[in-house]
């Protein structure tokens, strides 16, 4: 399976290396698809020929606007995920879009005593799990399952 990641940077506060983001996302998606635990992915499409994810980095104002519009929350957030799970006749799969506010990620990293990239890895894993159908706001058990998967992913990303 080929994985394509589109990265768009629409903010200028925090410098984000697109190549590193692409590499991390590919590792996360590959781990989730190649793991022996087939319950990890809620996607019913098995072995798509080509998988696409879009990642857009935005500033505080745009994130607040999107959070208000799509979640009814008038505040800045770190990440929003918009799953598509559209399977094209060609066998390609567009998982969806992840919108990230790097400034918020940076402040959370400081708060949790992590590096920017450690926190961004957690945010990327979280967003990809949302694209795969997980939702921590549905129930406590779903939230626990999602946190456990995030930890598995992060353990796999360590050098």
Curated annotation (Swiss-Prot):
Protein source organism: Thermodesulfovibrio yellowstonii (strain ATCC 51303 / DSM 11347 / YP87)
Recorded family membership: Belongs to the endoribonuclease YbeY family.
Binding site for Zn(2+): 126, 130, 136
Function, as annotated: Single strand-specific metallo-endoribonuclease involved in late-stage 70S ribosome quality control and in maturation of the 3' terminus of the 16S rRNA.
Cofactor binding annotation: Binds 1 zinc ion.
Predominant localisation class: cytoplasm
GO process annotations (BP): rRNA processing
PANTHER family per UniProt: ENDORIBONUCLEASE YBEY, CHLOROPLASTIC
InterPro entries, per the entry: MetalPrtase_cat_dom_sf_prd, YbeY, YbeY_CS
GO CC field: cytoplasm
Domain of life: Bacteria
UniProt gene name: ybeY
Reported cofactor(s): Zn(2+)
Protein name from the UniProt record: Endoribonuclease YbeY
GO molecular function annotation: metalloendopeptidase activity; RNA endonuclease activity; zinc ion binding
Keyword Nuclease: yes
Subcellular location: Cytoplasm
Record-listed E.C. numbers: 3.1.-.-
Gene3D superfamilies: Metalloproteases ('zincins'), catalytic domain
Keywords: Cytoplasm, Endonuclease, Hydrolase, Metal-binding, Nuclease, Ribosome biogenesis, rRNA processing, Zinc
């Amino acid at each position: 399976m080929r994985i394509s990641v589109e990265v768009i940077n629409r903010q200028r506060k925090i410098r984000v290396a697109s190549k590193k983001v692409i590499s991390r996302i590919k590792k996360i998606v590959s781990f989730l698809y190649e793991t022996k635990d087939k319950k990890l992915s809620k996607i019913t499409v098995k072995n798509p020929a080509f998988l696409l994810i879009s990642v857009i980095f935005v500033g505080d104002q745009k994130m607040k606007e999107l959070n208000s519009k799509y979640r009814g929350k008038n505040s800045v957030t770190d990440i929003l995920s918009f799953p598509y799970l559209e399977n094209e006749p060609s066998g390609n799969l567009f998982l969806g879009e992840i919108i990230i506010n790097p400034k918020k990620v940076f402040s959370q990293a400081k708060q949790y005593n992590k590096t920017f990239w450690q926190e961004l890895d957690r945010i990327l894993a979280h967003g990809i799990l949302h694209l795969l159908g997980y939702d921590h706001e549905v129930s406590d058990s779903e939230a626990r399952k999602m946190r456990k998967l995030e930890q598995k992913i992060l353990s796999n990303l360590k050098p």
